[in-house]
From Swiss-Prot:
Listed name of the protein: Protein msa
Gene, per the UniProt record: msa
Keywords: Cell membrane, Membrane, Transmembrane, Transmembrane helix
Highest taxon listed in the record's lineage: Bacteria
Protein's membrane topology: Multi-pass membrane protein
Transmembrane segments: 3-23, 27-47, 55-75, 103-123
NCBIfam families xrefs: membran_MsaC
Length: 133
């Protein structure tokens, strides 16, 4: 249980720091941090916990919640639309679609599936490691 709480608090800190940084970070760097750091924290601590399915469930729920709050926070910032326009000009050579419309269900669904798939793979890896020992 302590690793679950540690994971939730560490991920809250990651999203808290990102929220504090706000729009003062490159959008690709922010996207990479959002996609990589929370799953790294959860993955590393997953191998230390004994409550596998509960750990996966609560990590997905809370990380999705943190992600949602982070995005809603960014969209309420007064400079958000100008930030998106500037970033799109900077990324004109890369085919990335960034919209300034409301944050929606498809983003949460993608992030949930992303987390779920990685944690399921880690779950089966952990089971294989336990059986070999």
């Amino acid at each position: 249980m302590k690793y679950l709480i540690l994971s939730l608090v560490a991920n809250l800190l990651v999203f808290g720091v990102l929220s504090a940084i706000g729009l003062n970070i490159n959008i690709l760097a922010a996207m990479m941090i959002v996609l990589v750091i929370p799953i790294m924290i959860s993955g590393i601590l997953f191998f230390k916990t004994n409550i596998d399915k509960t750990y996966i469930f609560f990590n997905i729920i809370f990380i999705d919640f943190y992600y949602y709050i982070y995005n809603v926070h960014l969209m309420t910032l007064p400079k958000f639309n100008n930030y998106i326009k500037a970033e799109m000009m900077e990324l004109e050579d890369i085919d990335v679609l960034i919209t300034s419309k409301d944050f929606g269900f498809d983003e949460i669904l993608f992030y949930t599936l992303y987390l779920l798939l990685i944690l399921i793979v880690l779950y089966y890896l952990k089971k294989q490691v336990k059986h070999k020992i």
